[in-house]
Amino acid sequence: MIKCTRRINFDAGHRIIGHKNKCQFLHGHHYVLEITIAANKTDTLGMVIDFGLIKNLAKKWIDANFDHNLILHQDDKEMGQQIENYTRQKIYYMRNNPTAENIATHLKNEIFPKLFVSQNFFVTSLKLYETQNCFVEV
């Protein structure tokens, strides 16, 4: 198996409903997302996937939905709507708390399978860095 990884950076805010410490408050991170795609063999050009294709598909989705936006739990809709009305900022709602674990799982299981439709390669893992020192891998 051959693997290729592409890194994408984005900035987003979130909060964790029910957290007992400072993560219960709105705050932001400079996220780094590493997308690893694998194939059993390369294509006729000798590639698993063109790195530009990963960038075009994944970064386009990230920029449209996460970058410089708020990622909130759907139970935070009332607050999100007030923020959106005041700032015109886009809010991305998730079915669960927007922890690094849940964001990475959401991307890997729900978003990227729709973006990377191919029988020749597949997303094997995602690493999502919330800080330089803290990341999750799914």
Curated annotation (Swiss-Prot):
Q: Which domain of life is it from?
A: Bacteria
Where's the active site on this chain?
23 (proton acceptor), 68 (charge relay system), 130 (charge relay system)
Name under which the protein is recorded: 6-carboxy-5,6,7,8-tetrahydropterin synthase
Pathway involvement of the protein, from the record: Purine metabolism; 7-cyano-7-deazaguanine biosynthesis
Q: What more does the record tell us?
A: The active site is at the interface between 2 subunits. The proton acceptor Cys is on one subunit, and the charge relay system is on the other subunit.
Family affiliation: Belongs to the PTPS family. QueD subfamily.
Report the source organism: Rickettsia prowazekii (strain Madrid E)
- SUPFAM superfamilies in the cross-refs: Tetrahydrobiopterin biosynthesis enzymes-like
Instruction: List positions binding Zn(2+).
Output: 14, 27, 29
